[in-house]
């Protein structure tokens, strides 16, 4: 069979050396299970201390001179670490940019529906890109498009801050970006 390990997930290596894996050193700076510094001891003494307490000897800082080791429950340490990273991921929120398209002749009912959606997007914490599209002869009435944008700006004043307001028309459209107000 050709190939090799196709489709298999690579095995993740431990970031820390444990117990018998700590080789090539005679002395280590030992930290006890409760966090207090024991001092510089031989590797055998450190392993014996870890074994007596029923915990693991974990090499925390291998590049230090002498290497720093700590007596701890390694499984619990990894669990706490993964729990902390999950908490950080929960706190991060991806900001999306939602887009709403209007026309210069957008009717009052349609305007109200789109305004409701725009306010909902802002309350969810998303930015909103408002586009006014011009077709055919509507290009002659760009002032109506600016009026629609100004009306939107006034209607969303308590929810949003205008990030960018169009100064000129580009590719038959005007674009305004609204960002949610900080609470």
Swiss-Prot record:
One of its GO terms (molecular function) is ribosome binding. Its main location: cytoplasm. The keyword Disulfide bond does not apply. One of its GO terms (cellular component) is cytosol. GO terms for biological process: ribosome disassembly. InterPro entries: T_IF-3_C_sf, T_IF-3_N_sf, Translation_initiation_fac3_CS, Translation_initiation_fac_3, Translation_initiation_fac_3_C, Translation_initiation_fac_3_N. PROSITE patterns: IF3. The keyword Cytoplasm applies. Keywords: Cytoplasm, Initiation factor, Protein biosynthesis. Signal peptide: none annotated. It holds the Pfam family IF3_C. It is found in: Cytoplasm. Monomer. HAMAP family: IF_3. Belongs to the IF-3 family. IF-3 binds to the 30S ribosomal subunit and shifts the equilibrium between 70S ribosomes and their 50S and 30S subunits in favor of the free subunits, thus enhancing the availability of 30S subunits on which protein synthesis initiation begins. This is Translation initiation factor IF-3. It comes from Vibrio cholerae serotype O1 (strain ATCC 39315 / El Tor Inaba N16961). The gene is infC.
């Amino acid at each position: 069979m050709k190939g090799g390990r196709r489709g298999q997930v690579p095995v993740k290596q431990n970031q820390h050396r444990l117990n018998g894996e700590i080789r090539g050193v005679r002395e280590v700076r030992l930290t006890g299970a409760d966090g207090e510094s024991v001092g510089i001891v031989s590797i055998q003494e450190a392993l014996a201390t870890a074994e007596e307490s029923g915990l693991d000897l974990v090499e925390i800082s291998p590049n230090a001179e002498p290497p720093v080791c700590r007596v701890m429950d390694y499984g619990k340490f990894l669990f706490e670490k993964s729990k902390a990273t999950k908490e950080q991921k929960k706190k991060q929120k991806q900001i999306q940019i939602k887009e709403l398209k209007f026309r210069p002749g957008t009717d009052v009912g349609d305007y109200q529906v789109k305004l409701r959606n725009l306010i909902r997007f802002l309350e969810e914490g998303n930015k909103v890109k408002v586009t006014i599209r011009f077709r055919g002869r509507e290009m002659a009435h760009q002032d109506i498009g600016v009026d629609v944008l100004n009306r939107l700006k006034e209607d969303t004043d308590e929810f949003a801050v205008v990030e960018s307001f169009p100064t000129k028309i580009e590719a038959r459209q005007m674009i305004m970006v609204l960002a949610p107000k900080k609470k």
